[in-house]
């Protein structure tokens, strides 16, 4: 049943509520994904939850530091959107492209050059080279760190790997 304020659903005997497929699709909710449940006055609020987004200030600091040290554009993502972007703050909260999400699902690191660089979101300016490191904790994918520069060098990989270890350490706790 649909009302002017939303949908009406029954709670089953186990306390479950079905979220319609259209809503799951538009919010990019996948099977097994976490949602945050909060209570208001006479309301129950479901909110998409991202462990990476919950570490926003740490992600901002990591992206800022990496960008300054490497002189490159740095993005930190969760599995559906950009969480931190130092050089272009307007890129934050942009949805990731399906192609980029599919690549992340492989849980592989990559260095892409030229035309092989993946667009993370619609309208993104591609760098000449791109380093992608997935954020994986206990086998679960939580996001990625992406560095775009004119040339990816060993120092880019090592510094980004260090930032990755810091974020993974926080996500494990």
Language-model segments: residues:
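Short, solvent-exposed cationic patches
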Residues: 41-42, 102-116, 163-172
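A short beta-strand signature within small-molecule sensing/ligand-binding domains used
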Residues: 125-134
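Intrinsically disordered, low-complexity terminal regulatory regions
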Residues: 8-84
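Short hydrophobic/glycine-rich mini-motifs in sensory/regulatory modules
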Residues: 135-145
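A detector for short, charged/polar N-terminal pre-domain segments
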Residues: 1-8
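Structured interaction and signal-relay segments at domain junctions
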Residues: 63-122
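Juxtadomain coupling helices with adjacent low-complexity linkers
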Residues: 56, 60-65, 146-173
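A generic structural motif
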Residues: 24, 89-90, 148
